[in-house]
């Protein structure tokens, strides 16, 4: 099968990479990464995979399946267009918007499947298959790879716990402008090493501000890395606000504290005053109610820790093609066509 991994944003890299790994393991597949150069100036896998920044080259590849962890894919590309999502943040309005770009939605777990199947009955132009989320395959394989590094970090800094601060980048939702003093208080009062890992789209002034802050405290470390997953595996507790990484951390069965989360349903400890941070961390670690809530999230949001998520995705794509053939393009209204062309440009079609 000819596969395009459609990488518009940097955060998509480690969502898509497990598909490359499984496609290679299977054999008989050709994989091409489309990398959107306007948003990804330096592609970390440039020496390891076949990739292009050219939409024309992507079209000429004649893909049979396109995997997309974003909201849009050019309608004029051939291939079954598959939405695989960029996280679990169901409270964000755009998570449930059907933009008509996709032939299939491969959902993470029962909670998402139920809602997208309801939407499929309304729109009648896409299918829904529950597969799990591809990054979980990487986690299943590497869950304990960083245990020794974690122990060495704690030993080096002389601390008992690792706390990960992973805020969202959205200026309207982020805790970055108001939480700084209480992160300092946490580092002074608790026996913790604080790792700070920001979203790639975070404003540069906030990045610079917190890098400078970390330089002032021995047990505060600013992490420069495109992937947060490694640090989630090493951390004991997460602090956030309204980020899809909250759910990823809960799926590891680990406690989360948020400041002013906008979620309608809260499965963790949410505070509305940053001064409550230190006490909240103590509470969320020990409280049985939060443990039960995490178990519910695991069962409903993504129970697939078997390491076979991508296998199900590839089989799902092949099954669609067996039944319906390879779509030549996606039928869209003029506005969606215009948006596609404005974002990714035009191509010369083969005659």
Question: What spans do the regions from the language model cover?
Answer:
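Active-site and donor-binding regions of nucleotide-sugar-utilizing enzymes
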Residues: 4-143, 147
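Conserved catalytic-core segment of nucleotide-activated headgroup transferases in glycan assembly
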Residues: 12-27, 135-210, 305, 309-311
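Catalytic donor nucleotide-activated moiety binding site of glycosyltransferases and closely related
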Residues: 32-46, 187-222
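Short beta-strand scaffold positions
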Residues: 35, 68, 107, 240-241, ...
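Donor nucleotide-activated moiety binding/catalytic core segment of transferases
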Residues: 52-57, 202-247
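A donor-sugar binding/catalytic signature common to diverse glycosyltransferases
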Residues: 72, 77-85, 225-268
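Catalytic binding pocket for nucleotide-activated donors in carbohydrate/polymer assembly enzymes
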Residues: 123-124, 130, 244-305
